[in-house]
């Protein structure tokens, strides 16, 4: 915050305190509708757009496994964050290049509930004036659900029908091997099933793996 802004705020404070309670109560409540979740900026000669897919919540207990719960809660409290729940935002990035649009990760994908807290990437693409049919490359960083979930539509079709899908070879080899699934912890097995769903024959035909 700039010094000038702080000074103006300090000078205005006495005047704000003189506002009658009736006037304060008459103010309209803040709207509940979410503003379009995208932000556009430049990377050298390219235009990039971050696309908000929503956010999820997770309990703090058990989420961080390499530190005691008390230490995690202390750090959260020092950062003025809740100590019982973590809010995790999901954002994908799209870059406009002379060859077309390149999308990095695809969000959680379509959700059944209309008020679901995630799965908003397509709506925010539309709000930003970006057409999924113009995406020529989709780069997947890894195979967690919030990265590959948006590869297909609610009907099971390819969400980006003209795109080549680029994935790390190591990720592809691990999550498509049934032997790995059988010896993985229970908590990881959903990712194997989700990988099979997202990389159905239609999207698998668009696949290009890269060496790690």
Predicted segment positions?
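N-terminal export signals
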Residues: 5-26
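C-terminal segment of N-terminal export signals and the immediately downstream linker at the start
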Residues: 19-49
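Conserved beta-strand hairpin/beta-sheet module of binuclear metal-dependent hydrolase folds
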Residues: 37-128
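Hydrophobic/aromatic beta-strand patches that form the interior of the parallel beta-sheet core
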Residues: 49-51, 139, 166, 208
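Short, solvent-exposed loop/turn and secondary-structure capping segments
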Residues: 61, 114-115, 150-152, 177-178
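Active-site metal-binding motif and surrounding structural segment of the metallo-beta-lactamase
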Residues: 92, 116-166
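Catalytic metal-binding/acid-base residues of hydrolase active sites
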Residues: 107-109, 144, 171
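Metallo-beta-lactamase
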Residues: 126-130, 134, 161-164, 169-212
């Amino acid at each position: 915050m700039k010094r000038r802004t702080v000074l103006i705020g300090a000078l205005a404070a006495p005047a704000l305190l003189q506002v009658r309670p009736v006037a304060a109560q008459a103010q309209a409540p803040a709207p509940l509708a979410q503003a379009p979740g995208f932000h556009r900026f430049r990377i050298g000669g390219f235009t990039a757009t971050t696309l908000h897919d929503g956010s999820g919540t997770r309990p703090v207990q058990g989420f961080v496994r390499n530190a005691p719960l008390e230490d995690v809660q202390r750090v959260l409290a020092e950062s003025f964050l809740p100590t019982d729940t973590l809010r995790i935002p999901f954002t994908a990035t799209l870059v406009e290049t002379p060859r077309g649009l390149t999308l990095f990760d695809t969000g959680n994908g379509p959700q059944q509930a209309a008020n679901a807290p995630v799965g908003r990437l397509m709506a925010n693409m539309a709000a930003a004036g970006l057409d999924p049919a113009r995406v020529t490359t989709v780069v997947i960083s890894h195979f967690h659900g919030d990265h590959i979930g948006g590869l297909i539509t609610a009907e099971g079709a390819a969400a980006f029908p003209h795109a080549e899908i680029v994935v790390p070879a190591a990720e592809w080899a691990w999550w498509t091997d049934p032997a790995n699934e059988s010896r993985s912890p229970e908590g990881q097995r959903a990712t194997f099933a989700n990988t099979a769903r997202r990389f159905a024959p239609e999207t698998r035909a668009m696949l290009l793996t890269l060496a790690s």
